[in-house]
Amino acid sequence: MIRYLLSKLLLIEAILLLVPVSVATYYRESSQVFIALFSTIGILVLLGGLGVLQKPKNQRIYAKEGVLIVALCWILWSFFGGLPFVFSGQIPSVIDAFFEISSGFTTTGATILNDVSVLSRSLLFWRSFTHLIGGMGVLVFALAIMDNAKNSHLEVMKAEVPGPVFGKVVSKLKNTAQILYLLYLGLFSLFVVIYYLAGMPLFDSFVIAMGTAGTGGFTVYNDGIAHYGSSLITYLVSFGVLVFGVNFNLYYFLMLRRVKAFFGDEELRAYVIIVLVSTSLITLNTLHLYQGVSKSFEMALFQVSNIITTTGFGYGDITNWPLFSQFILLFLMGIGGSAGSTAGGLKVIRGLILTKIAKNQILSILSPHRVLTLHVNKTVIDKDTQHKILKYFAIYMMIILSLIFIVSLDSNDFLVVTSAVFSCFNNIGPILGTTSSFAIFSPISKILLSFAMIAGRLEIYPILLLFMKRTWSKR
């Protein structure tokens, strides 16, 4: 069943590559670009076609199979998705291309390119299109369009959807995937129109809207959003990424007119408070760098919204910001957006629960015999869930520290190395410090950071389980 589903997913990626083909046709690009795209499509069709020839008798997907399908799918899609860049010569290195498209599908937005103008329009579009597909999840997208998606495929969605809890918004799995994707694509389309009306060229409005929707961060120009020189566009992008950093289940509740469920959500309230407090602190701390409070607020809101939602759109140089403001951004890198959103990171809900666990631990010292319960949205969080979140946080920190230790061999700049690891593992994109490109890192570090991006997007476990012998046993 693993082989069969992975083969179908490769065929889906082949179909998706027809999108940049149409862009290349519109812009009348060179034959080299067409050869690169059709060569990749041919490889995917050949491998996918061979894999679906024999349909498996047992189509049941268990937890282990679900984890393997998700992990292998993201690795394969990233590898094959990078081949057009290699075949066209626009990113000659296979490792660099794998890094770039891993960054795309995981909606990280980190890049090895110092100059994005080297890319043709079609591959520039494909790079950002991977944000749109990866935003709600490659497998969620696949299940939304597959005609035979079954509730047994819930194990696949559990392994991919970000956040500590996965729930169906309606009874049927396929309907859940379709509802989530319709909401997602509806909001994406809205922001394409908004950006276009705000003054962006149509091509740019699609690219930036895809980055906004997927909370990815790839742009059309080297200077990012600053290229447009518009405060209106800056504010719209800030608002847009914050919208996509909210749990999509809440938008579904809003559609059902369950207004109390939306505004009463503890994670949403914490998310808004963190954004407001962080923006206020950075605004005050950077007043001396800008002409007036309004510009300082604009820049602070843009950076805070882009970091907490793990979007990472670029806007100017923040290396001259006070260290206090830079450390606030580094802190926000660890938090991330809401569970069930397109944002990466640890997630606000986990931070909220960890804070409440710490509070209860302190209270238990003061009152040893008192029975303490932990509530989120008036729901009791049982001890098992609390322990799972604590274990996840411990593994999260161990991986972060291990990656910093290894990647530090490439650079002596603590802020660059630390923010690069946080940026990749939390799917954020930019590096704090003297560089904005990951081209400075060695091939080994790029491979590690590529897997860090995929591991971070899949909540660690699917990638870790790939390296366990028991995962591959038939028992």
Model-derived segments and spans:
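Membrane-proximal intracellular helices of multi-pass ion channels
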Residues: 1-475
